Amino acid sequence: MAKKVVATIELMLPAQQASPAPPVGPALGQHGVNIMEFVKQFNAASRDYEPGTILPVVITVYQDRSFTFIMKTPPVSYLLKKAAGVEKGSSDPKRVKVGKITVKQLEEIAKMKMKDMNTRDLKAAMRTVAGTAKSMGIEIEGWKE
């Protein structure tokens, strides 16, 4: 028989830098999960990413206090800010542009995010990422909408 799911917890954690401090400790502690075990497993699983990269993680807690977790790819906004070399998006994206990326960078980000998106079409994924870039005030050189 399958284990009974008690809770599903969604967190955004820095790769290789998870610690028992908030938000991890309180979120897992209230469900009786071994926090240090999660921290060790998450930090080991996030070795492929640059330290500090923000990763969404979905933790499923079972009745016997065991857990499983799924790491997703970094958010599109994080990847766009990194590619454009900006600290944050524009407060007025229609008038104030904060950075530029190339179509090649757009394609790389779309390919990276494909497994988390609900499309298998690269062009559709690129349009989705381009929409996020537009709402952040990041221009895409050579992109025709």
From Swiss-Prot:
Gene Ontology CC terms: cytosolic large ribosomal subunit
GO process annotations (BP): translation
Any GO MF annotation of the entry: structural constituent of ribosome
SUPFAM superfamilies, per the entry: Ribosomal L11/L12e N-terminal domain (SSF54747), Ribosomal protein L11, C-terminal domain (SSF46906)
Signal peptide: none
PTM section of the record: One or more lysine residues are methylated.
PROSITE patterns associated with the record: RIBOSOMAL_L11
Listed Gene3D superfamilies: Ribosomal protein L11, C-terminal domain, Ribosomal protein L11/L12, N-terminal domain
Self-association and partners: Part of the ribosomal stalk of the 50S ribosomal subunit. Interacts with L10 and the large rRNA to form the base of the stalk. L10 forms an elongated spine to which L12 dimers bind in a sequential fashion forming a multimeric L10(L12)X complex.
Protein's recorded name: Large ribosomal subunit protein uL11
Lineage: Bacteria, Pseudomonadati, Aquificota, Aquificia, Aquificales
Originating gene: rplK
